[in-house]
From Swiss-Prot:
Name of this chain's protein: Decarboxylase MYCFIDRAFT_34057
The reaction(s) this protein catalyses: atrochrysone carboxylate + H(+) = atrochrysone + CO2
Enzyme Commission number(s) of this protein: 4.1.1.-
Keyword GTP-binding found: no
Length: 154
């Protein structure tokens, strides 16, 4: 697989019609923090501080998926010859936007820099957490077939 800076891979900066980027943060909780304290901080401290900023800069959707011990245990019911590896992350946070510029504006916002950057150190293991970004492709929404992320029902 070519590196992300490969000259054969075109740069993506402008919004694509009916296409949305999804930044996925594969998060680990801060060492010594319980699962419940981590989830509580993200839901009741971090999210309230972040969501208005996301709206301000045109973010389309932001979700968190907390992978606590009881839900991870459910995976034993799904394991088979192909699904055998349980992801070790404590949370997946997904941010959906039209252009990379939308998210870059958040990171440049003075309020973000003053309050949110420091808050991450209160609950997240920022040295172990990982990120990736890609296009969202949606096929089923609310039990209905769809064409594209915000496309028409088929």
């Amino acid at each position: 697989m070519p590196p992300a800076t490969d000259p054969e891979i075109p740069a993506v900066t402008a919004p694509q019609k009916n296409k949305y980027l999804c930044l996925t943060i594969l998060g680990y909780k801060k060492e010594g923090m319980t699962e419940e304290a981590y989830r509580n901080h993200m839901l009741n401290v971090s999210a309230p501080m972040t969501k208005d900023l996301m709206v301000k800069y045109g973010i389309r959707r932001w979700t968190m998926i907390h992978n606590q011990t009881p839900t991870r245990a459910l995976m034993t019911q799904l394991f088979d010859s192909q699904m055998v590896n349980l992801a070790p992350y404590d949370c997946f946070s997904q941010v959906v936007f039209e252009s990379i510029e939308d998210y870059k504006k958040i990171k440049l916002d003075p309020w973000y820099r003053k309050y949110l950057v420091g808050d991450h150190e209160n609950f997240a293991d920022t040295k172990r957490s990982e990120m990736t970004i890609g296009w969202i492709e949606e096929f089923v929404r609310d039990g209905q077939l769809v064409e594209g992320f915000e496309g028409e029902y088929v």
